[in-house]
C-alpha cells in the first residue's frame, strides 16, 4: 500500500510540475513537451490496480457530465461516445483530471478510456492520453461549462471545436459547434456511490 501511495504522491507532484512548467505557453507551441508530460501522467493512471485517490484531492474529480440537451455523456469500452438519459449510468461516471489552469482530460471510470476529439471533430474513447484528449474547460455566464479542443479549430475563422451532444444524445461533430449553442453546454454533476450498480460501485471505490 505504501508503494501505491508513493506512486500517486509522485503523480500529484507530476501534475503540479506540469501546471507550473506549462504556464501560459500555448499548447500548440510546445507539442513535444506536452506529449512527454501526458505520457508520464498516463503511465501512472493505468487501469486495473487498486489505488488511493486521496493524494489527488483537488486534481482529480469524479463526476457525471450532463449536457443541456438532457443527456449524460458516456464513454464505452469499444471507443464510442454517446449520451444517455439514465442517471448514474455505468459508463457515465467520469474522472476529470486537471492538467493545468483551465486544461483537463476526461476518462471513463469503467471503460478506462479518455475522451478524445479527432481532426474531423468526432468524439472517441482513447486508450492513451494524447493531445487529442486535452480540453479547455470554460465556465460560461449561464453557469454551464464548455469543453473546447486544444488541438483543433476552424482554420479560417479560428472558431473552436467543442464537445457536444445532439438532441438525440448522439455526439455532434466539433466543426458544427459554437460556444453559445446548448449542444455544447455541460454541467459536471456529483456522483453518489449509493446510486451506482454494485460493479461500478466497486470500481468507484478501488480505482
Curated annotation (Swiss-Prot):
In adult, predominantly expressed in heart, in the cardiac myocytes. Not detected in brain, lung, liver, kidney and white adipose tissue. In embryos, predominantly expressed in the brown adipose tissue. GO terms for molecular function: fibroblast growth factor receptor binding; growth factor activity. GO terms for cellular component: cytoplasm; extracellular space. Glycans are attached at residue 78. CDD domains: beta-trefoil_FGF16. PROSITE patterns: HBGF_FGF. InterPro entries: Fibroblast_GF_fam, IL1/FGF. The modification Phosphoserine is found at residue 111. It comes from the Eukaryota. Coiled coil: none annotated. Its main location: secreted. SMART domains: FGF. It is found in: Secreted. GO terms for biological process: fibroblast growth factor receptor signaling pathway; neurogenesis; positive regulation of brown fat cell proliferation; positive regulation of cell population proliferation; positive regulation of endothelial cell chemotaxis to fibroblast growth factor; positive regulation of MAPK cascade; regulation of cell migration. Plays an important role in the regulation of embryonic development, cell proliferation and cell differentiation, and is required for normal cardiomyocyte proliferation and heart development. PANTHER family: FIBROBLAST GROWTH FACTOR. This is Fibroblast growth factor 16. It comes from Rattus norvegicus (Rat). The gene is Fgf16.
Amino acid at each position: 500500500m505504501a508503494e501505491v501511495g508513493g506512486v500517486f504522491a509522485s503523480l500529484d507532484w507530476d501534475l503540479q510540475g506540469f501546471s507550473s512548467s506549462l504556464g501560459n505557453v500555448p499548447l500548440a507551441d510546445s507539442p513535444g513537451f506536452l506529449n512527454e508530460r501526458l505520457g508520464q501522467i498516463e503511465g501512472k493512471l493505468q487501469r486495473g490496480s487498486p489505488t488511493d485517490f486521496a493524494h489527488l484531492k483537488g486534481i482529480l474529480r469524479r463526476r457525471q457530465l450532463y449536457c443541456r440537451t438532457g443527456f449524460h455523456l458516456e464513454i464505452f469500452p469499444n471507443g464510442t461516445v454517446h449520451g444517455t438519459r439514465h442517471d448514474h449510468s455505468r459508463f457515465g461516471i467520469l474522472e476529470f483530471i486537471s492538467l493545468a489552469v483551465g486544461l483537463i482530460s476526461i476518462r471513463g471510470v469503467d471503460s478506462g478510456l479518455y475522451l478524445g476529439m479527432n481532426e474531423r471533430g468526432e468524439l472517441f474513447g482513447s486508450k492513451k492520453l494524447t493531445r487529442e484528449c486535452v480540453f479547455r474547460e470554460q465556465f460560461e455566464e449561464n453557469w454551464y461549462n464548455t469543453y473546447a479542443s486544444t488541438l483543433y479549430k476552424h482554420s479560417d475563422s479560428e472558431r473552436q471545436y467543442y464537445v457536444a451532444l445532439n438532441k438525440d444524445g448522439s455526439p455532434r461533430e466539433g466543426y458544427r459547434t459554437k460556444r453559445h449553442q446548448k449542444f455544447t453546454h455541460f454541467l459536471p454533476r456529483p456522483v453518489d456511490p449509493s446510486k451506482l450498480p454494485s460493479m461500478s460501485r466497486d470500481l468507484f471505490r478501488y480505482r
